Swiss-Prot record:
Ranges where the IF rod domain occurs: 1-150
PROSITE patterns the record matches: IF_ROD_1, IF_ROD_2
Protein name per Swiss-Prot or TrEMBL: Keratin-like protein KRT222
Keywords: Coiled coil, Intermediate filament, Keratin
Taxonomic placement: Eukaryota, Metazoa, Chordata, Craniata, Vertebrata
Source species, domain of life: Eukaryota
GO MF entries: structural molecule activity
Gene Ontology annotations for the cellular component aspect, listed alphabetically: intermediate filament
SUPFAM superfamilies membership: Intermediate filament protein, coiled coil region (SSF64593)
Coiled coil stretches, renumbered: 2-150
Gene: KRT222
Family: Belongs to the intermediate filament family.
Amino acid sequence: MELSQLLNEIRANYEKILTRNQIETVLSTRIQLEEDISKKMDKDEEALKAAQAELKEARRQWHHLQVEIESLHAVERGLENSLHASEQHYQMQLQDLETVIEGLEKELQEVRRGIEKQLQEHEMLLNTKMRLEQEIATYRHLLEKEEIRYYGCIQGGKKDKKPTTSRVGFVLPSAIINEISFTTKVPQKYENENVETVTKQAILNGSIVKESTEAHGTIQTEKVDEVIKEWEGSFFKDNPRLRKKSVSLRFDLHLAATDEGCLETKQDNLPDIEVRLIMRRSCSIPSIKPPSTAN
């Protein structure tokens, strides 16, 4: 009895101990599980908060990007409108420039035609000038030959002999300076005078721009001073408005050459002297009347 009772008591204690251990094990396991669950929940909460914060930041950035996109769309629309307006503006300017270019091209063609016409006229004038220069040279050569023939074989000037008078005129186009030469005589008071006067006038558009008069003759040596004074007086007598200071007078004295076929000079007398009086005036001086020519 006592042994079975003791065994029952031991069994009961053991069951109590076993039950207590099981309860403690279960409790410790539950506590551990609760702690693990709590830690996991804390971590999940932190992760959730972080995810919410990240989501919030993402939403904020998305909103900012939406605003920026709308702003960029507005800028794009503004740029498109500006581009369209600029295209229209420059298209109008291009049309205006094309019109101006067409006008300038027409003017250029007209200028080229005018230049070609002027070149043709200039060439014609040059040809005319060259032809007239040849004619002038021919007439000058004829006059020089006539002068050499006249002065080479005649003994001095005689009262009953008068020097020949000739007049040569050239009519050129109005754009070219005309040169008119005419020959006249100077009054003679001495037997041995042989005098001829040549006047040249340069005319531009009907106005005298330059004039020169040249008197040429062979006189006796002892009468040089008197003849020169007489010639000078005759120039200013025909032109009372002409002042002596406004013209340029120059006297050239040369020993007259004696031709073998002409009159021989005497050794006792002084040789005759060739005298040339040259008078020039410019366009700023009053006009000189051309000497009267013999018919």
